[in-house]
Curated annotation (Swiss-Prot):
A lipid is attached at C16 (N-palmitoyl cysteine). InterPro entries: Adhesin_E (IPR043088), Adhesin_E-like (IPR031939), Adhesin_E_Pasteurellaceae (IPR016595). GO terms for cellular component: cell outer membrane; cell surface. Acts as a multifunctional adhesin involved in direct interactions with host epithelial cells and host proteins. The keyword Signal applies. The keyword Lipoprotein applies. Keywords: Cell outer membrane, Lipoprotein, Membrane, Palmitate, Signal, Virulence. This is Surface-adhesin protein E. Gene3D superfamilies: Surface-adhesin protein E (2.40.128.710). A lipid is attached at C16 (S-diacylglycerol cysteine). It comes from the Bacteria.
Amino acid sequence: MKKIILTLSLGLLTACSAQIQKAEQNDVKLAPPTDVRSGYIRLVKNVNYYIDSESIWVDNQEPQIVHFDAVVNLDRGLYVYPEPKRYARSVRQYKILNCANYHLTQIRTDFYDEFWGQGLRAAPKKQKKHTLSLTPDTTLYNAAQIICANYGKAFSVDKK
């Protein structure tokens, strides 16, 4: 998953920063935070991929749909800003989970100049939705089960 995110990020970086001179952009190695910030849930041990628990909400119209943000703290700075010395330290991805069929849709990806999806936002001009069916016994599937179980109670109680 981390390789896919980095590949997509590098592709977006190339598209967004074509006019910036490469000589000014040295490779920036980052030291992501080692402590997990309150309100964030690490998906995999020793991987900087988190769910922002404060961003989770259930759709009013379709209670099987849960919206949330995933955050990736980067270990290399990405030059996605017009300023040649500003770089992204994190990526925030807006996702929608369908608890009825375990389809996960990535709606939007934004870059931030601080860790934890904070700070100045840079959004790619073109973004495509991407939906995948989660496979049982994978980290994302297990996380989806937990999200659906915890937030499923909220909408099943409302139906009474």
